[in-house]
């Protein structure tokens, strides 16, 4: 089989930087899928992406589809010919559909008789004839939320397309994609190198772009270069660069030929909380801040330019000039905000709606204050501090700094609270109330902060569900999924003795008569348990393990987690499959019993040795494991219950549960009822596959 390397590049105007990597990887995945569907073998598909281009390269792509042998069976010979031996209409119709005559058909003998059959070899198409359609479909299926048209064209794409290049080895593929004729023209850097040049082979692409066009097309290479140079520059200044993955990807998506430089700002700005300065540098300017070895912000920053002059002084001074007004604003807002205490901003919260039916932010803080105190009392936190933090929790939203730099909410509340002389735990809780802010984020450290964070999240969950506005589809305007998962993480990872039903019920009571959903407690709890499913699936825990625990609907998250871990462990035991099957059998037997099933085992009715053995072992385990269940030691309990396997197997092999004698039958059902209840103390293991 002969192969060639295949290149496809789509040259565009500047692509959205936050979407570039996602578009590029999706493009490569789509091409892989299309090649597989076309039955074209290849070694691997590489992807490249820069601000003005998306490209893929399929290495070792077969030059043609493989030939396929087909066998199309027709009617039985007995039905294919009439009494005179002439083909019937059924046979002629089948042959016509195969493109042959009846006498050209082969015959195949089976144990059910002889049949007509058409055998043929379909030659595979040359790969080059399929590539335009493969790329067109791959582009059409990209995750582009908003398309655009350009010029007088009817075609749509994420940005206007100017060039399309498809090479299969040294052959330029002819055709048109997105209304643009395919050619061998590659556009270089907008300001450096050759603006346009041509290539004559798929393998020339990367080298020609770098040497002629001054473009590093490999996204990951560009990213690694920026990271290494940034760390090198920071080290030279005696610091460490703060380089978040998402920002690094975005900066990588903004430049074609990265030039990493450093600049500085006036030291007086360091009097402003570092978070506000960093917000400006990262969010607005896409700069990387630099910290010293003690974690203090230095008056320097790293930026990445898309041009590379011999003397970068003008570029550096330009970036310093751009950032100065933003830092000056932050300084002004900070100094102005310090003139008023956080507590004095409480009345202004009455002017801001949280939600039309649920009242103002002042109403919300009153509810958070009360619920945070309740939670603190349950988990051993300082109730007064939790209530104080709850009261002040939204005051920083009324400050100039947070109004201008919204992502500093919470952290600025902490700084202002410290300035006001609030207790340190209260101040820190104002920042940590929003944790975790995203998947994998750190949790609140103190129990006071946990109390406020949970109170805030449960207030939102209960309130929004309470007015019938649960998330639908992908829409989640109040970020309820994040609030639910964040709450679960706090309770589970901090091992807090909290019950979801209790928390929602207490939260609902604080809304007075504002809630219209009578099932709010059940709805919120079900929603949160559903988030457990997503959490554990992300961890790789089997779905049937989660379903086994969900069947018991434990509403204490820490307890729920302990059950999941125990069942997940139990599932690995040799006896698990047999005991799961036995529990399923028991469940089916008991489901058919009319009326209430007793749990009283009458030892005088134990006839068979096997039922005696099972009854005695079940009774013994009930006594032995009672404290184990009470302490939530579910893995220990299931390990002991695994010892039932042989006894249960023997019981089902030798004992007739539905005996004719009603007393024997009811007693055996009672044995099984007790057996099942032992396992149900942890989960419904009959669900396990």
UniProtKB/Swiss-Prot annotation:
Task: Name the InterPro entries on file.
Answer: DALR_anticod-bd, Gly-tRNA-synth_bsu, Gly-tRNA-synth_heterodimer
GO MF terms listed in the record are: arginine-tRNA ligase activity; ATP binding; glycine-tRNA ligase activity
* Keywords assigned: Aminoacyl-tRNA synthetase, ATP-binding, Cytoplasm, Ligase, Nucleotide-binding, Protein biosynthesis
Q: Where in the cell is it found?
A: Cytoplasm
Which species is this UniProt entry from? Answer: Actinobacillus pleuropneumoniae serotype 5b (strain L20)
Subunit and partners: Tetramer of two alpha and two beta subunits.
Family of the protein in this entry: Belongs to the class-II aminoacyl-tRNA synthetase family.
| Cellular component annotations (GO), alphabetically ordered | cytosol
Domain of life, per lineage: Bacteria
**GO process terms (BP):** arginyl-tRNA aminoacylation; glycyl-tRNA aminoacylation
Q: What is this protein called?
A: Glycine--tRNA ligase beta subunit
Q: Which reactions appear under catalytic activity for this entry?
A: tRNA(Gly) + glycine + ATP = glycyl-tRNA(Gly) + AMP + diphosphate
Keyword Cell cycle appears in the UniProt entry: no
Q: What is its EC number?
A: 6.1.1.14
């Amino acid at each position: 089989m002969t192969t060639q390397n295949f290149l496809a590049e789509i040259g565009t105007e500047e692509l959205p930087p936050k979407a570039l990597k996602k578009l590029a990887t999706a493009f490569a995945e789509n091409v892989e899928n299309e090649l597989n569907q076309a039955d074209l073998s290849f070694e691997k598909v590489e992807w490249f992406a820069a601000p003005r281009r998306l490209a893929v390269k399929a290495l070792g792509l077969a030059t043609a589809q493989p030939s396929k042998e087909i066998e199309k069976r027709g009617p039985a010979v007995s039905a294919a010919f009439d009494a005179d031996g002439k083909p019937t209409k059924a046979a002629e119709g089948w042959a016509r559909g195969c493109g042959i005559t009846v006498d050209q058909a082969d015959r195949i003998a089976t144990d059910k008789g002889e049949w007509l059959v058409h055998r043929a070899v379909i030659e595979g198409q040359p790969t080059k004839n399929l590539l335009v359609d493969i790329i067109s479909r791959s582009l059409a299926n990209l995750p582009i939320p908003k398309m655009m048209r350009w010029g007088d064209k009817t075609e749509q794409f994420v940005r206007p397309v100017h060039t399309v290049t498809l090479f299969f080895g040294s052959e330029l593929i002819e055709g048109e994609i997105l209304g643009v004729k395919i050619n061998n023209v590659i556009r270089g850097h907008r300001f450096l190198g050759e603006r346009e040049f041509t290539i004559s082979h798929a393998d020339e692409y990367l080298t020609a772009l770098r040497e002629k066009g001054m473009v590093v097309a490999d996204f990951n290479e560009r990213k690694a270069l920026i990271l290494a140079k940034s760390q090198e520059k920071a080290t030279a200044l005696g610091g460490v660069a703060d380089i978040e993955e998402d920002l690094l990807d975005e900066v990588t998506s903004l430049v074609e030929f990265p030039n990493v430089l450093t600049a500085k700002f006036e030291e007086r700005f360091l009097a402003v909380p570092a978070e506000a300065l960093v917000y400006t540098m990262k969010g607005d300017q896409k700069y990387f801040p630099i910290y010293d070895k003690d974690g203090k912000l230095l008056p320097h920053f790293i930026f990445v330019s898309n041009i590379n002059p011999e003397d970068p002084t003008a570029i550096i001074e330009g970036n310093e000039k751009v950032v100065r007004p933003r830092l000056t604003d932050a300084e002004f807002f900070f100094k102005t905000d310090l003139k008023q205490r956080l507590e004095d901003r409480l009345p202004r919260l009455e002017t801001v709606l949280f939600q039309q039916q649920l009242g103002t932010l002042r109403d919300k803080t009153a509810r958070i204050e009360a619920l945070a105190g309740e939670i603190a009392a349950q988990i051993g936190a300082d109730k007064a501090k939790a209530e104080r933090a709850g009261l002040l929790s939204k005051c920083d939203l009324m400050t100039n700094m947070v109004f201008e730099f919204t992502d500093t909410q919470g952290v600025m509340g902490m700084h202002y609270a410290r300035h006001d002389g609030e207790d340190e735990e209260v101040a820190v809780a104002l920042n940590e109330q929003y944790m975790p802010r995203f998947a994998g984020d750190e949790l609140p450290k103190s129990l006071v902060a946990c109390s406020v964070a949970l109170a805030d999240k449960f207030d939102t969950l209960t309130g929004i569900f309470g007015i019938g506005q649960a998330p639908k589809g992908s829409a989640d305007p109040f970020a309820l999924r994040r609030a639910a998962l964040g709450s679960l993480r706090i309770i589970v990872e901090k091992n807090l003795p909290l019950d979801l039903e209790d928390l929602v019920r207490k939260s609902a009571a604080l809304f007075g008569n504002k809630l219209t959903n009578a099932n709010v407690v059940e709805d919120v709890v079900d929603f949160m348990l559903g988030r457990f499913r997503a959490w554990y699936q992300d961890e790789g825990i089997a779905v049937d393990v989660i379903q086994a625990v969900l069947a018991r609907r434990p509403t204490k998250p820490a307890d729920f987690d302990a059950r999941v871990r125990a069942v997940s462990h139990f599932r690995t035991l040799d006896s698990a499959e047999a005991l799961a099957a036995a529990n399923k059998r028991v469940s089916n037997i008991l489901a058919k019993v009319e009326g209430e099933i007793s749990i009283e085992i009458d030892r005088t009715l134990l006839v068979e040795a096997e039922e005696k053995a099972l009854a005695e072992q079940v009774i013994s385990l009930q006594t032995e494991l009672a404290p184990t269940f009470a302490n939530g030691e579910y893995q220990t309990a299931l390990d002991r219950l695994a010892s039932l396997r042989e006894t249960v197997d023997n019981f089902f092999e030798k004992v007739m549960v539905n005996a004719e004698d009603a007393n024997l039958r009811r007693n055996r059902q009672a044995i099984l009822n007790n057996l099942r209840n032992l396992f149900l103390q942890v989960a419904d293991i009959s669900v396990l596959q």
